[in-house]
């Protein structure tokens, strides 16, 4: 629990770099958009000034082993989600964000970065699509009707759309399998949306959900509308997202949700104090022993226990000493 968004980014960056140093070759998933702004800045700062900070800075103060070094190129990175469809070169696409801030900014190995490309027909399937290479050729009006999964196509265009949807359903299954075959995510970092969504797992998402092509609700559409040209354009789109079970598949995973400001206090309260319920996606993380909320003081206003009371419980050993991760 910290005072502001800048400190929140610093705290999260330190925990991430500690984990990376202890888990070379680990499997990770990090957020895109506005949520990780200061997290990214602090990670880049510490990577640039690692030796200095390890000898005389905060890395020394927190007792990090001086022999450790975060090997960013060893990590296997999985993109959390993406709009469907969207050009990967679009400056508001999450793929564009990953390439600019994580591959270029953090130095991840591009060969170990798993992207969600929702614009190009996968190369292995192109022979079945003739001259069609991109999804805007399949969905020229931009409308994604996932009902075509089970509906009988009315014409050749609908048949093509149905084939494309099923192709990306298989992509999602393969993506999920790839994560599981690596033992699941070792480190997950995410924000929490206005309806409590984690990645694009909106309220009502099953806690056993996996990577999938799906629709999103109005609250999530509205939050994305400014970046993507207005609500009418966003309402036409679907999304691909990892599932809630994808996040918790590895029982030893470190899962961190960051939330800043009083506007997130209701989502924090629901996630922390409600019993597991599909209405509150973040309650699915309660099964993880290393799940944590990193939050600002203003995001705690609805929590039943005050910070003072929590610290007293820690002092009395009624809560674990690492309840506050700093």
Which stretches of residues belong to each language-model region?
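ATP/nucleoside-binding phosphotransfer catalytic cores, i.e., glycine-rich phosphate-binding loops
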Residues: 3, 7, 241-326
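Active-site histidine-anchored catalytic micro-motif
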Residues: 40-41, 45-90, 123, 161, ...
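Catalytic cores of processing enzymes, dominated by hydrolases/peptidases
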Residues: 218-249, 258
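Short, conserved loop/helix-junction motifs that constitute active-site signature segments
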Residues: 50, 67-74, 106-108, 247-252, ...
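Gly/Ser/Thr-rich active-site loops/lids in small-molecule metabolic enzymes
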Residues: 200-233, 275-287
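Glycine-rich beta-strand-to-loop/alpha-helix junction loops that act as flexible
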Residues: 30-35, 190-194, 260
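N-terminal glycine-/serine-/threonine-rich phosphate-binding loop
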Residues: 1-29, 38-69, 132, 137-138
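Ligand-binding beta-strand-loop-alpha-helix segment within the catalytic cores
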Residues: 57-186, 313-325
């Amino acid at each position: 629990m910290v005072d502001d968004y800048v400190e929140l980014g610093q705290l999260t960056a330190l925990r991430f770099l500690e984990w990376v140093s202890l888990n070379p070759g680990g499997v990770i998933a990090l957020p895109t958009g506005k949520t990780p702004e200061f997290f990214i800045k602090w990670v880049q700062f510490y990577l640039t000034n690692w030796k200095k900070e390890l000898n005389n800075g905060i890395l020394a103060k927190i007792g990090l082993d001086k022999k450790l070094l975060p090997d960013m190129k060893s990590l296997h990175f999985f993109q959390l989600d993406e709009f469907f469809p969207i050009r990967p070169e679009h400056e508001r696409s999450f793929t564009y964000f990953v390439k600019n801030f994580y591959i270029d900014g953090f130095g991840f190995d591009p060969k170990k970065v798993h992207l969600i490309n929702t614009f190009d027909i996968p190369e292995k399937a192109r022979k079945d699509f003739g001259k069609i290479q991109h999804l805007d050729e399949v969905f020229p009006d931009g409308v994604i009707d996932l009902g075509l999964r089970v509906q009988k196509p009315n014409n050749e265009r609908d048949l093509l759309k149905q084939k494309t949807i099923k192709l990306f359903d298989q992509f999602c299954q393969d993506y999920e399998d790839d994560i599981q075959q690596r033992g699941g995510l070792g480190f997950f970092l995410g924000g929490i949306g206005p309806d409590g969504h984690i990645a694009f797992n909106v309220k009502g998402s099953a806690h056993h959900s996996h990577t999938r092509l799906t629709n999103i609700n109005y609250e999530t559409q509205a939050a994305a509308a400014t970046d993507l040209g207005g609500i009418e354009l966003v309402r036409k789109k679907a999304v691909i997202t990892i599932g809630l079970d994808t996040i918790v598949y590895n029982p030893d995973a470190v899962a961190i949700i960051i939330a800043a400001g009083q506007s997130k206090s209701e989502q924090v309260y629901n996630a922390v104090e409600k019993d597991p319920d599909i209405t509150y996606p973040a309650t699915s993380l309660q099964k993880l022993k290393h799940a944590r909320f990193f939050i600002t003081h203003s995001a705690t206003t609805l929590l039943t226990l005050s910070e003072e009371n929590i610290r007293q419980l820690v002092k009395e050993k009624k809560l674990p000493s690492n309840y506050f991760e700093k």
